[in-house]
Amino acid sequence: MNKAKIFMNGQSQAVRLPKEFRFSVKEVSVIPLGKGIVLQPLPNSWKDVFQEMAEISSDDIFPEGRKDLPPQKRKYFE
């Protein structure tokens, strides 16, 4: 398991990432997940955003052979 060091940088808390986890961008988004967080790189420009969107295949979003669940029976408000 890889570890990262947490330290204070002025009034902010910072994380020193191991070399293999370095980001190539200047900013990341911080997403809370349970008791932890997920860091994701933010694109540097709109050009990067559109390039990333172009790389997404519809098969990644809607895989072939995906089955929909049957409709659920629900109690209506009375």
UniProtKB/Swiss-Prot annotation:
The lineage, from the top, is: Bacteria, Pseudomonadati, Pseudomonadota, Alphaproteobacteria, Rickettsiales
Taken from the UniProt record, the cysteine pairs bridged by disulfide bonds within this chain are none
Q: Which Pfam families match?
A: MazE_antitoxin
Function description: Antitoxin component of a type II toxin-antitoxin (TA) system. Upon expression in E.coli or S.cerevisiae neutralizes the effect of cognate toxin VapC2, partially inhibits the RNase activity of VapC2.
DNA-binding among keywords: yes
Matches recorded under NCBIfam families:
TA_anti_VapB
Which is one GO molecular function term here? DNA binding
Q: List keywords of the entry alphabetically.
A: DNA-binding, Toxin-antitoxin system
Subunit info here reads: Forms complexes with VapC2; probably VapC2(4):VapB2(2) in the absence of DNA, and VapC2(4):VapB2(4) in the presence of DNA. Crystallizes as heterodimers with stoichiometry VapC2(4):VapB2(4) in the presence of its probable promoter DNA. The heterodimers are in contact via alternative VapC-VapC and VapB-VapB interactions. This subunit contacts DNA.
Q: Which gene encodes it?
A: vapB2
Q: What is this protein called?
A: Antitoxin VapB2
Where does this protein come from, organism-wise? Rickettsia felis (strain ATCC VR-1525 / URRWXCal2) (Rickettsia azadi)
Annotated ranges, domain SpoVT-AbrB: 4-44
Family the entry assigns: Belongs to the VapB family.
Matching PROSITE patterns: SPOVT_ABRB
**Keyword Cell cycle (UniProt):** no
